[in-house]
Amino acid sequence: MGINSIFPRQLEADDIVAYICREHEGTKVIVSVDQDFLQLVSSECTLYDPIRKKFFEDGNFQEQTGYQNVDEWYTAKCLIGDSSDNVPGVRGFGKKTVQKYLKDPGYILSEKEHKIFQRNADIFCLDKYEELPEEKKYYKEQLEVKVDACYKTFLKYCEEYHFKRILDKKEDWHNLFFMKSLYNKLNDITS
């Protein structure tokens, strides 16, 4: 159908997304509400949150998150923790305390605070693929498979399996297939 597919073996999907974003050149747009993907935002990678209809990019990162850059955001996440993932943060660190910490290069975490920070960094970091060279090689090979985008085959498949919602929006799928300004189309949604 013209779409590369990667079948996870040992890694979770978010680690595979991280691999694609960090290891492959070119523009990438992640469409997800998962804020953990903010750590992947770069000059080549944008996160689009379809619920909030917001883009998180290199150029607007501070405006959208309140943090100057990805490193600051990641440091804050490791200190604050994430209640939605059931990961407690360093005691006494909320958004205000984190901002003070980030502005004070002389602040040193206690040994206990540092252990919690490091544990959270290990949990939140999307680079598990680095620990598994065979997996990394496998995903690289999966992405190198050349698939021809065939819109007609895609539509035939959708008709055969009665994918009515896709068929109702053929033009949108056509634009996706041929990458006709996906970024601009998503940007129009947010305006």
List PLM regions with ranges.
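Extended two-metal-dependent nuclease catalytic cores across DNA- and RNA-processing enzymes
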Residues: M1-D168, F177, L182-I189
